[in-house]
Amino acid sequence: MKRFLLIFILLLTSCSSSATNQGAPIDSLAPCSSIKTTGAAADGLMLECLDGDGELAVQAIEGPAVISVWASWCSNCEAQRPNFIRLHNEAGDKLQVIGIDVEEQKKSDGYEHALKRGMNFPQLYDPDGRTSNYFGPGVPITQFIDKNGVIAFQKIGPIFTYEEMQELVSEYLEIKI
């Protein structure tokens, strides 16, 4: 009887509604029009919106923000993906989380990947690797943009744990999540 009760409690708590979306498929991407911008840097690095909703200058993204440069073929990008989804879900209006999909065979590959993986934050698209001139080569790369729009920190390589993500946000953006 105790064993049954223990199994029942474990099953019940594992279905808790307090869990956040950690990658369940979604129907549509957050529109690029939801990205807050300063209105400046219109001549900067212009990238298409992955959802087809126009284009945006990366330098015009208003901070505080966390920008993830990723690709569907990148295993380290995939490993850190849940941390960005969770950050977006838990940060609310404290900061923006934005993805930049790079160097896909087709734009639709990145779009479908983002939908299937539940990437519920706005996504930009770089079809030809122009972001490497701004962010540096390779993926994953994460930029932490402070409230003044200054690059406070750039992490080259994966952020494997949510605790590390929280520490970086706290240290460089002075925001507790």
Predicted regions and their residues:
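N-terminal targeting signals for export/organelle localization
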Residues: 1-48, 167, 177
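Extracytoplasmic
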Residues: 40-42, 61-62, 92, 137
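A short beta-strand-turn-helix
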Residues: 44-65
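Loop/turn elements at helix/coil->beta-strand transitions in domains of secreted/extracellular proteins
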Residues: 62-64, 93-96, 120-121
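Short pre-active-site segment immediately N-terminal to redox-active cysteine/selenocysteine motifs
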Residues: 63-65, 70-73, 138
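Hydrophobic beta-strand anchors of alpha/beta hydrolase catalytic cores
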Residues: 66-67, 97, 142
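Structural microenvironment flanking redox-active thiols in thiol-disulfide oxidoreductases
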Residues: 78-117, 127-133
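Thiol/disulfide oxidoreductase modules built on the thioredoxin-like
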Residues: 112-120, 126-177
